[in-house]
A protein has these predicted regions:
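Glycine-rich phosphate/diphosphate-binding loop of Rossmann-like nucleotide-binding domains
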Residues: 2-40
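C-terminal binding/interaction regions
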Residues: 8-15, 19, 94-152
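Short, solvent-exposed amphipathic alpha-helical segments in soluble enzyme
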Residues: 20-26, 49-50, 77-79, 128-130
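N-terminal beta-loop-helix "entrance" segment that forms/cooperates
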Residues: 33-53
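Glycine-rich phosphate-binding loop
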Residues: 48-90
Length: 152
């Protein structure tokens, strides 16, 4: 049963999202990946967000570029934690997505990571920190990773 739902706004985001997937696997976190667009498939975004908790998902990760509405759209339909990964998809090189992800109204938060691959990996590490509060094997995997970072 997936603990994390990874949602990308377009199939063209797959290369960056693969960094998230690889990191979730490293952290021993079960996940699922979906392509859903806040603009092209808003009803499917709503349905996914509303059903996520009953399906066992505990954290949502949303990767989107441009107006990056996906994270906010998901957060508007659920009280699960939503982590946003802004992606560079226009001449603005991700600044538009970064600001859109970060500037959520009070009460509908989206945790905003860095633009691109660093943000993609940190989204998974942040999910590990959240899930590690409840699951010892995830906490231990993340702590081991951090130990290895110190020893480099």
């Amino acid at each position: 049963m997936p603990q994390v739902g990874v949602i990308m706004g377009s199939a063209s985001d797959e290369q960056v999202v693969q960094e998230t997937v690889n990191t979730l696997e490293q952290m021993k976190i079960d996940y699922e990946v979906r392509v859903l667009s806040a603009h092209r498939t808003p009803d499917r975004v709503r349905e996914y967000a509303q059903q996520a908790r009953e399906r066992g998902i505990q954290v949502l990760i949303a990767a989107a570029g441009g107006s990056a509405a996906l994270g906010g759209a998901l957060a508007s339909w659920t009280t699960l934690p939503v982590i946003g990964i802004p992606l560079a998809s226009s001449e603005l090189k991700g600044m538009d997505a970064l600001l859109a992800t970060a500037q959520m109204p009070p009460g509908i938060p989206v945790a905003c990571m860095a633009v691109g691959s660093w943000g993609a990996r940190n989204a998974a590490y942040f999910a590990a920190e959240i899930l590690g509060l409840k699951y010892d094997h995830i906490r231990q995997a993340y702590e081991e990773y951090r130990r290895q970072l110190r020893e480099r």
